[in-house]
Amino acid sequence: VKESSIKKKRIAVMMGGLSREREISLKTGKAILKALTEKGYTVTPIDVGEDITEKLVKEKIECAFLALHGRFGEDGTIQGMLELMRIPYTGSGVLASALAMHKIMSKKFFRCEKIPTPRFEVFQREEIKKDLLKKISLPLPVVVKPAREGSTIGVSIVQKDEELGPALKRAGEYDEEILVEEFMKGKEITVGILEDIPLPVIEIVPKSGFYDYHSKYTKGETQYILPARISRERYLYAQEISLKAFQILGCSGVARVDLMTDENENPFVIDVNTMPGMTETSLLPKAASYAGIPFEDLVERILLGASLKMEGGK
């Protein structure tokens, strides 16, 4: 999309939504709204609810900047609706969004494409309810998480056998499928991808030892180290496999790939976030800023990549 043509269009910043990450989405949306307004765009904030199609028609929206997190926002649902309404939108399309949101499906893709990812097993909620649990073959500790939630919602680190049942039940409150994943003992790192270009690698050091919902969104609870303290060879490899994961899932625009290293600093892809946070504490803007891209320019670049992904992205 050309800057001159989009300046005249009515742009919606779609935020809020119906997921458990609503609060974070509103923060992201407000930051994007401010950046685009300062750049001279005609922007309307739209809180996504069940009447979303009526709102888009009423406001005569011609382009959508997606600032949603979690279900119904980054899982392909909204993307499909915008495709039907022929409203160009930012970020990944229907299939890439759905695949990236489903941690189990995306890990199967990574495995097929030889992208390093921690070993894993899958449990069904029904198995837990009926106490039909097969024994896990992975050595402890393991990470237990719902297949389709973001912001570490429903995630537990299991150190002892007796913690496994409660952790599975907790994850089962959020999804019918549960992922049990090998725990990586190294560093937590993340790689932003902007238009097929990997951004600088960030190392995440939470004070609590676990980068949970509280650490993620509370100032001062986590230390971010840029560039990450890993060897140059591993650093470049982390960028390479992150870009490959982004491309394998068919992502477009912008995304953030989260990784863990083992004790030898080998990076493993955990998951791909097709709608990374864009708040003042968010990782992608930090990496972009380090690469010399100010926040307002980053937001504008994402907007200029807005398109319809079906029928050749017209």
Where are these regions (language model features)?
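Active-site "cap" helix and flanking loop/linker of ATP-utilizing ligase/carboxylase catalytic domains
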Residues: 203-255, 286-314
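Hydrophobic beta-strand scaffold residues
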Residues: 43, 88-89, 117, 142, ...
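Phosphate-binding site of ATP-dependent enzymes
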Residues: 159-240, 261-268
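Conserved metal-phosphate-binding beta-hairpin within the catalytic cores
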Residues: 182, 191, 246-278, 288
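Active-site nucleotide/adenylate-binding loops and adjacent lid/helix of ATP-dependent enzymes
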Residues: 2-15, 58, 99-181, 185-187
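Glycine-rich phosphate/pyrophosphate-binding beta-alpha loops
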Residues: 70, 207, 273-287
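ATP-binding N-terminal substructure of ATP-dependent carboxylate-amine bond-forming enzymes
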Residues: 1-101, 105, 124-132, 304-313
